[in-house]
């Protein structure tokens, strides 16, 4: 019985650490996204990185490939200024992978809400680097 308790306790501690690391990644993801820092934003990901948006699936194999996209001009043309997490709920966790159901809000420069979206982020520990490995969103 003691051995089971010890193993369970060890597993719970690892899961708590995984959740803490995953949430830090999402904090950095949003901060670098809002700062429009493509290089920093790309460092919050693990590769290959997969994004499901609408009916489209996009895979970026490398950080360099991801850094080459220019998402900020398109978003700014919609009135977007910044985004924020409204909720983040862990739905699955292991020592090296955390699935997080999120809701985020897009805002204009006067902090007026534009749109709200649900999404799923899969954050992984790959070779000692915690990053978003995949995300699926109802955002375009």
Where are these regions (language model features)?
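A solvent-exposed, acidic/Ser-Thr-rich amphipathic alpha-helical stretch
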Residues: 38-89
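Short, cysteine-centered beta-strand-loop-beta hairpins and adjacent loop/turn segments enriched
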Residues: 78, 106-114
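Short beta-strand edge/turn micro-motifs at domain boundaries
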Residues: 114-140
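A mature extracytoplasmic/lumenal domain signature
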Residues: 45, 55-56, 102-104, 121, ...
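Short, low-complexity N-terminal intrinsically disordered segments enriched in polar/charged residues
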Residues: 1-43
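A short hydrophobic beta-strand element
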Residues: 82, 96-104
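Detector for glycine-centered tight turns/loop "hinges" at secondary-structure junctions
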Residues: 55-57, 111, 128
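Hydrophobic/aromatic beta-strand elements that line small-molecule binding cavities or substrate pockets
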Residues: 86-91, 103-106, 118-124
């Amino acid at each position: 019985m003691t051995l089971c308790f010890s193993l369970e306790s060890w597993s719970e501690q690892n899961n708590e650490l995984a959740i803490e690391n995953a949430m830090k990644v999402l904090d950095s993801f949003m901060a670098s996204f809002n700062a429009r820092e493509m290089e920093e934003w790309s460092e919050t990901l693990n590769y290959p990185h997969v994004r499901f948006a609408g009916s489209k699936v996009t895979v970026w194999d490398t950080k360099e490939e991801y850094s080459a996209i220019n998402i900020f001009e398109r978003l700014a043309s919609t009135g977007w200024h910044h985004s924020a997490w409204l909720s983040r709920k862990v739905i699955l966790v292991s020592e090296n992978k955390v699935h997080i159901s999120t809701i985020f809000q897009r805002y204009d420069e006067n902090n007026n809400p534009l749109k709200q979206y649900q999404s799923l982020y899969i954050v992984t520990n790959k070779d000692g680097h915690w990053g978003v490995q995949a995300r699926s969103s109802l955002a375009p």
